[in-house]
Design a protein with these regions (language model features):
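Metallo-beta-lactamase
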Residues: 3-81
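C-terminal regulatory/interaction regions
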Residues: 86-129
Length: 129
């Protein structure tokens, strides 16, 4: 999901989440080969592991519960998808990723817009099928 070669490894009481779930913040979907459908499916699989496994991310601090965090990451992605859908209602169905970023991320530091653009590109690909 995050990238085409992104994996998580399940251990007895922990999950090495790589970049699928980070220790802080949210994962950027790579604009070249990241796939939102695959990413959401990965989050669903991590939720299905059940609560109680520590998340050991590729970046940032360990997190106490992989399933709880996967659920929160999925909710965040669904919220962003709703925001992108709303932006397309205003901007039109053919809006470019950058136009959507300007609309959805207007309150976010502009230095983060390139990363946001990559995620929006993946979201638009997902929504446009």
């Amino acid at each position: 999901g995050h990238t085409a070669d992104s994996v998580s490894l399940v251990l007895d009481d922990a999950v090495l989440t790589g970049d699928t779930i980070l220790g802080a913040g949210s994962t950027v979907l790579d604009g070249k080969d990241g796939d939102l459908g695959d990413y959401l499916a990965s989050l669903d699989r991590l939720q299905q592991l059940g609560e109680g496994r520590v998340a050991l991310p590729g970046h940032g601090p360990d997190q106490p519960d992989t399933a709880v965090l996967a659920r929160a990451y999925r909710a965040h992605r669904e919220q962003r998808l709703d925001q992108v859908r709303a932006a397309l209602d205003v901007l039109g169905p053919d809006a470019t990723p950058m136009k959507v970023v300007r609309h959805v991320y207007a309150d976010v530091d502009k230095t983060l817009w390139p990363a946001a653009r990559m995620s929006v590109k993946a979201q638009l690909t997902y929504l446009r099928g």
